[in-house]
Amino acid sequence: MTIALFPGSFDPITNGHIETAKKAAEIFEKVYLVAMTNTSKHYLFSPGERADFARDALKDVANIEVLEKPDEITVDLAHELNAKAIVRGVRNSADFRYEQEIAGINKRLAPDINTILLFSSPENSFVASSMIKELAKFDKDVSQFLPEKAAKALRRKLGNEYAE
């Protein structure tokens, strides 16, 4: 079975993340989407909440399993899950350069794990969780960029007037 790991912060998960996960599910027999922690980021949602939003959005994709592993190194987790590839989404050239650097480090740490880059569609090429959170803080409707459960939770968390 070909297994891939799709790690990320997913704070919150966006339609771009969902697109990448679904593309990976078409390529690999099993995809683990894992809510992880980047020590250089500050989170609005807990790993459990982030994983829950992903589970809800991807519940109809049989070969995707969502996990939360906030305290692991990506390549160690890939080995633990028997993944042969790490999947990453790329929106633009800045993402590409960043992912290229991370892929190089990961290859040094785990020569048996490959990084697969999947490019976003034009409609998701500008969507970033940090940007969406910023818009939501200013009471902008961000529901077009997020799965429904994540959008509602973001509105509630920030106390937006249009929260349901």
Curated annotation (Swiss-Prot):
Transmembrane helix keyword on record: no
The gene coding this protein: coaD
Protein localization: Cytoplasm
Organism annotation: Lactobacillus helveticus (strain DPC 4571)
NCBIfam families tied to this protein: coaD_prev_kdtB, cyt_tran_rel
TM ranges: none
Protein name: Phosphopantetheine adenylyltransferase
EC numbers for this chain: 2.7.7.3
Cofactor(s) the protein needs: Mg(2+)
Catalytic activity: (R)-4'-phosphopantetheine + ATP + H(+) = 3'-dephospho-CoA + diphosphate
Keywords (A to Z) from UniProt: ATP-binding, Coenzyme A biosynthesis, Cytoplasm, Magnesium, Nucleotide-binding, Nucleotidyltransferase, Transferase
